[in-house]
């Protein structure tokens, strides 16, 4: 029975992996400004806006840039929304009890993927509590929580494969340009660093006491901790 179950599980995963539509380049799923503020809005490349609708308990909606074609696409409460040409990625932030008489809570703060064209049931990329999800090409970088290491820096493929810890320090991957993630130090320093998602290496960009870097074009914006966060 165990062998059969394992075989079925592999078949489901293999089928899901084969169905995934991968990106051809290092597309980024949202802007730093949005992701630092819970990512409740996201504009896809075609102009479609995905957002947590405050008029419907922050459920996931879409609309055109002119406000037309308002559509509810999921009953999930959505945060840290990202989008590419094929999928919406978001952190499900559902209340503990979502249905009358419910006594079980499953995957209420999980990392999810939803097909933009079909709007079918979301696929779980990580069932653990997640935050600050950010799409980089064919991977999602985010903060993952578990009872062993608590909150750490993680990555997972957009097909749900190869979920693993990148660093034990909970760096927030909000500012992304192509294959690079810009972040500030958390424990040993507060410098601004650049993480290369191809080589899994980091290099120093700016030494100082800084917070929440956001790269736009050739300019890095940040808060200066020693000058009243200006």
Which residues does each predicted region cover?
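Residue position within the beta-strands of beta-propeller blades
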Residues: 50-52, 89-92, 141-144, 182-184, ...
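Post-signal peptide N-terminal segment of secreted/secretory-pathway proteins
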Residues: 57-61, 70, 75-85, 89-103
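Hydrophobic membrane-insertion alpha-helices, especially the h-region
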Residues: 1-10
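A structural motif specific to WD40 beta-propellers
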Residues: 70-71, 122, 163-164, 203
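Repeated scaffold domains used in trafficking and secretory/extracellular systems
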Residues: 36-44, 75-85, 127-137, 168-178, ...
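Structural motif
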Residues: 57-61, 96-112, 148-155, 188-194, ...
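Short loop/turn segments that connect beta-strands within beta-propeller blades
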Residues: 64-68, 114-119, 156-161, 195-200
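N-terminal, intrinsically disordered, polar/charged segments of Gram-positive cell-envelope systems
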Residues: 14-72
């Amino acid at each position: 029975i165990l062998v059969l179950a394992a075989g079925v599980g592999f078949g489901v995963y293999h089928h899901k992996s084969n169905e995934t539509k991968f990106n051809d380049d290092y597309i980024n799923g949202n802007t730093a400004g949005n992701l630092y503020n819970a990512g409740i809005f996201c504009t896809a490349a075609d102009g479609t806006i995905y957002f947590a609708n405050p008029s419907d308990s922050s459920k996931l909606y879409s609309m055109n840039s002119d406000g037309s074609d308002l559509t509810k696409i999921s009953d999930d409460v959505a945060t840290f929304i990202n989008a590419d040409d094929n999928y919406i990625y978001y952190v499900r932030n559902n209340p503990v009890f979502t249905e009358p008489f419910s006594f079980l809570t499953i995957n209420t703060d999980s990392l999810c993927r939803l097909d933009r064209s079909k709007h079918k049931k979301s696929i779980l990329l990580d069932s653990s509590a997640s935050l600050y999800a950010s799409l980089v090409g064919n991977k999602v970088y985010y903060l993952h929580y578990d009872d062993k290491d608590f909150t750490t820096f993680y990555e997972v493929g957009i097909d749900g494969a190869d979920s693993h810890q990148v660093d034990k320090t909970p760096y927030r991957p909000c500012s992304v340009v192509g294959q690079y993630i810009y972040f500030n130090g958390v424990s040993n320093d507060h410098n601004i660093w650049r993480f290369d998602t191809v080589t899994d290496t980091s290099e120093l960009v700016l030494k100082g006491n800084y917070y929440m870097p956001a790269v736009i074009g050739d300019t890095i914006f940040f808060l200066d901790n020693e000058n009243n966060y200006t």
